[in-house]
């Protein structure tokens, strides 16, 4: 059987310490439990994301980005595009001086629990929102009168065009009701 994923990309991803899954089933990565086969790379850092994005651009390989897979309906026929998964490997949560810093793969619920344990307030609205921090920033998630835009200090993202990492201020993210610049932008929240 022929491999779904470009071998050059798979080898580079493995060398960077990412997990390569040649025939992942998207249904195992979406909350609706739908989706067919794909070549998947479980990213482990913004740096590996940037390097792989650069390589895929050079090779003309198309890719899509997936977090916790909430609000995603994937085709049961799968995709030929490489799926870059921002998952548990990018879900660290650190708290210092009343500031929570976390990876885009962290679940919103896990960040809320960490805030509660550290006796921090402001994230109560996000408890129970399915999905990741990256997805929450991407669509300015909110509930019960609170939104991500009310609490975020900055977001780091990788450029889809050149793989560089950039930090965005709340103003630069253009956060509004269920919207951010990332919906029309060429950056991957990390």
Model-derived features: positions:
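Flexible, small-/acidic-enriched active-site or ligand-binding loops
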Residues: 172-182
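Anion-binding (especially nucleotide phosphate/pyrophosphate-binding) glycine-rich loop
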Residues: 4-133
């Amino acid at each position: 059987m022929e491999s779904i994923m470009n071998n050059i990309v798979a080898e580079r991803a493995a060398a960077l310490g990412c997990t390569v899954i040649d025939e992942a089933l998207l249904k195992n990565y979406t909350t609706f439990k739908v989706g067919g086969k794909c070549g998947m790379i479980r990213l482990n850092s913004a740096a590996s994301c940037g390097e792989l994005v650069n390589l895929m651009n050079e090779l003309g390989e198309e890719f899509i980005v997936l977090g916790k897979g909430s609000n995603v309906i994937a085709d049961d026929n799968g995709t030929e595009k490489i799926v870059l998964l921002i998952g548990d490997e990018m879900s660290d949560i650190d708290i210092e001086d009343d500031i929570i810093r976390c990876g885009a793969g962290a679940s919103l619920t896990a960040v809320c629990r960490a805030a509660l344990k550290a006796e921090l307030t402001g994230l109560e609205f996000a408890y129970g929102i399915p999905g990741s921090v990256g997805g929450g920033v991407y669509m300015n998630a909110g509930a019960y009168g609170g939104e991500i835009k009310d609490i975020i200090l900055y977001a780091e993202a990788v450029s889809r065009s050149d793989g560089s990492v950039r930090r965005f201020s709340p103003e630069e993210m253009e956060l509004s009701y269920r919207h951010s610049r990332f919906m029309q932008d060429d950056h991957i929240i990390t």
